Amino acid sequence: GKKSVWARISVVIAGPVFNFLMAFVFAFILLCNIGYDLPVLAGVTEGYPAEEAGMQAGDTILKIDHTRIHFFRDISAYTQFHSGDAVTVTYERDGERYQTVLTPKYNEEYGYYMYGFQGSAQKTKGSVLSNLKYSVYEVEYWIRVTIDSLKSLVGGKVSVNDMSGPVGIVNMIGDSYEQSVTYGYYMVFLQMLYITIFLS
């Protein structure tokens, strides 16, 4: 009957909802302990687009194209998944908002396109309310990275070997990520979300 249909629906959605709630709780605990990386530039690389556009240390990046930026990792991930693309960057300095278009330069030594953004390994530890807000952003971040990774795989931008589970996804967003966070904790968190998205 009608009741059994709703009962079946509730059973189907209960698993994914519970998994996302668990991921949120884990993100909250994680951020309370190690903090989060704000999208504030520690500097800009000389001779690269960010410097040439007048950006400088202390600028806070708010948006790249139509994607809102909450972590410095958001910048790294977006530029990795849009390698070589000109991007519109919205940033804030001393309470004023600015917008500029950056076209990356190819770095022969490293073998990839660069905009010249420099981040910091420093983490910000916020209030309980702030950590709750950034926990939502954390879950959103990993969902977006996972989806963008799959799009890159389908589009032929990366190989299956590059996408070998959560480790492959993490490798896509750069070695600096591993150096700037408590890597083990994030791997556990990422695996929880990975399982949630694909097995729920």
Predicted regions and their residues:
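Membrane-entry signal-anchor segments at the cytosolic-membrane interface
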Residues: 2-21
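Functional transmembrane alpha-helices
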Residues: 2-6, 105-199
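Residue-level recognition of oxygen-bearing side chains
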Residues: 5, 25, 49, 74, ...
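PDZ-domain C-terminal substructure recognizer with occasional recognition of PDZ-binding tails
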Residues: 14, 52, 56, 62-63, ...
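Hydrophobic alpha-helical transmembrane segments in multi-pass membrane proteins
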Residues: 19-27, 145, 183
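Bilayer-spanning, highly hydrophobic alpha-helical transmembrane segments
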Residues: 22-25, 29, 189-191, 195
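Cleft-lining beta-strand/loop regions that shape enzyme active-site pockets
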Residues: 24, 28, 75, 137-140, ...
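PDZ/PDZ-like domain segments forming the peptide/carboxylate-binding groove
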Residues: 24, 28-63, 67-70, 125
